[in-house]
């Protein structure tokens, strides 16, 4: 008669060792890589937009969005490991938002797109 002890015995040699934790982590690694992809140059000029006071925006960090300078979720579907920069406008005004993704003041343009490094880069390539 087989009792509860039979169920708890170690697997026979040669049997496939299933590790649910490893299986889950390898699945997660496909969608959330440990080393995020680098941002790519979306455009080499900033985009001027009117931000409305109190409204929350999501600025594209990865450079892959088709709705530049804002996020459309491309970072998730292309498995970049990057996330958009969420910010709230303090006042209604026109601003230049960076699309080269090299700014030191994200999401705002700081003129870095004029640098030789950005101008030599191809649109869609990482810096």
From Swiss-Prot:
Residues 1-14 form a transit peptide. GO terms for molecular function: 2 iron, 2 sulfur cluster binding; metal ion binding. Signal peptide: none annotated. The keyword Transit peptide applies. The modification N6-acetyllysine is found at residues 55, 86. [2Fe-2S] cluster 2 binds at residues 98, 100, 109, 113. Changing residue 75 to C: Increases iron-sulfur cluster stability. One of its GO terms (cellular component) is mitochondrion. It is found in: Mitochondrion. Its main location: mitochondrion. Gene3D superfamilies: CDGSH iron-sulfur domain, mitoNEET-type (3.40.5.90). GO terms for biological process: protein maturation. Belongs to the CISD protein family. Can transfer its iron-sulfur clusters to the apoferrodoxins FDX1 and FDX2. Contributes to mitochondrial iron homeostasis and in maintaining normal levels of free iron and reactive oxygen species, and thereby contributes to normal mitochondrial function. Monomer. This is CDGSH iron-sulfur domain-containing protein 3, mitochondrial. The lineage of its organism: Eukaryota, Metazoa, Chordata, Craniata, Vertebrata. The gene is CISD3.
């Amino acid at each position: 008669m087989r009792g509860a002890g039979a169920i708890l015995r170690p697997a026979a040699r040669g049997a496939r060792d299933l590790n649910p934790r490893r299986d889950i982590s390898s699945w997660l690694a496909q969608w959330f890589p440990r080393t995020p992809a680098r941002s790519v140059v979306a455009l080499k000029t900033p985009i001027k937009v009117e931000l409305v006071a109190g409204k929350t925006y999501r600025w594209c960090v990865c450079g892959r969005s088709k709705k530049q300078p804002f996020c459309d979720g491309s970072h998730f579907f292309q498995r970049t490991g990057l996330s958009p920069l969420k910010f709230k406008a303090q006042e209604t005004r026109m601003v230049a938002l960076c699309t080269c993704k090299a700014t030191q003041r994200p999401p705002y343009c700081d003129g870095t797109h004029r640098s030789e490094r950005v101008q030599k880069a191809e649109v869609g390539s990482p810096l």
